[in-house]
Amino acid sequence: MPEASSPRRTPQNVPYQDLPHLVNADGQYLFCRYWKPSGTPKALIFVSHGAGEHCGRYDELAHMLKGLDMLVFAHDHVGHGQSEGERMVVSDFQVFVRDVLQHVDTIQKDYPDVPIFLLGHSMGGAISILVAAERPTYFSGMVLISPLVLANPESASTLKVLAAKLLNFVLPNMTLGRIDSSVLSRNKSEVDLYNSDPLVCRAGLKVCFGIQLLNAVARVERAMPRLTLPFLLLQGSADRLCDSKGAYLLMESSRSQDKTLKMYEGAYHVLHRELPEVTNSVLHEVNSWVSHRIAAAGAGCPP
């Protein structure tokens, strides 16, 4: 058999023909997940995961949203999870944004009159913000959990940023260091789950990817004044990956009239996988906020 006729396989060597997937504009195969309600969905919501992880880590959130009669859909971004691409490498951050819009358009064709929402965590929060900014009146609302708005000041000092930009020209694949999983959550069992997840990339942040994250922060800063959609913003005060000051900046800079910030004192980065009292509160806040916005979108009036 010629090699060209061999089925495309995931990085884990599973044929894509056996899995839900889409093919992006670059011809790369992206693994998809769908959580569909039993009846006709009242709304659609795309879930955008963070750097180094995959959309399967949002199963609990997705099932909760599915219980609201939402069709929840997601994919592993290029270079992540079961999608193609060198691990945690992307030619341009816009690729992530473009792929989300492609997936959104594909699903929307089947449900043309159903309101659509975005949910994003960390890097996925930055992606969601940029997606929403590209289509200012398209989405009915957005949920952001610890979004990447400002980089951590410890890792993104002026000197370190300059050094990274210089290194990107000569050693783009040099590893800057791994994500310290202990700063993700105060819940040790959740940290252990992260550390043992075979689909999580723990190879370390390459210079070229770090530069794309810095580019994303700059783009988010420019995009914030264009945001007019309703959004819920959940942030931990002790987040050492995405500076909590970014949450206040987003609240101040966006033009949205319907915007809510809930700050969790002492909480770390992954609020939906934090100590039980935090995670339960996050699920409750998301459930309540989304329920009200679905009703408002269906009635064609503000909440």
From Swiss-Prot:
Gene Ontology BP terms: acylglycerol catabolic process; arachidonate metabolic process; fatty acid biosynthetic process; long-term synaptic depression; monoacylglycerol catabolic process; regulation of axon extension; regulation of endocannabinoid signaling pathway; regulation of inflammatory response
InterPro entries registered for this protein in UniProt: AB_hydrolase_1, AB_hydrolase_fold, Hydrolase_4, MAG_DAG_Lipase
Record-annotated active site: 122, 239, 269
PROSITE patterns referenced in this protein's UniProt entry, alphabetically: LIPASE_SER
Hydrolase in keyword set: yes
Miscellaneous: Short-term inhibition causes analgesia, while long-term inhibition causes tolerance to endocannabinoids acting on brain cannabinoid receptor CNR1, and a reduction in brain cannabinoid receptor CNR1 activity.
Protein's UniProt name: Monoglyceride lipase
Gene coding for it: Mgll
